[in-house]
Amino acid sequence: MLTRFAFFDFDDTLIHGDSGGKLLKYYLKKHPLSVFKLLKVVYHYALYLLKIEPLNKAKSAWLYPLDKMSDQEIEKFYQEVLEPCYYLNVIEELKKKKAEGYTIYICSASVEAYLRFCKLPVDEILGTKTDIKDGKYTSQMIGKNCKNEEKVKRIQEVIKNHNLEIDYDLSYAYSDSLHDIPMLKMVKNRIKIDTKDGHMSSFEIE
């Protein structure tokens, strides 16, 4: 079925800033003695930058707070830290598109472990996946980082499962980043978010 979609990135699109960094800062503030864990984070990111280790290991090290946080704590983080960071004009745009009958997807490199607590009126949340053990989300990544072409792949998988087809001319995509050009090219209407204030303008792609 031909469907009007609105695809939204999350970091610096729906919220200002990097949600993964906010998670780490939030956890360290509550558990300052865990600061030594940052050495492991730096170590794995250095190996990643040197192309010795894959991104998965570095990102999993960064997400170590998930191993220690309960679902209630993760939800509290979303409500107390991420929700106040919303660009209100972009949130209103999302709600407007939903009211107009658009199918709304959030597609982000941020992890589903906390994105699942988003209460916005969206139809799908597609984020980087992490392992679940004994019913609890962990820091260990599963599959690829949901970025660049991976976003297109994830969107296409869900659309196919629902027997839907993107109405190219009438669909929208919102992002702050050139990394999202593959997703932006899935639709005709491409909106750039200014990271300073959330101002929306046409995303010009050559």
Residue ranges and their predicted role:
Residues 1-50:
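Active-site neighborhood of HAD-like aspartate-dependent phosphohydrolases
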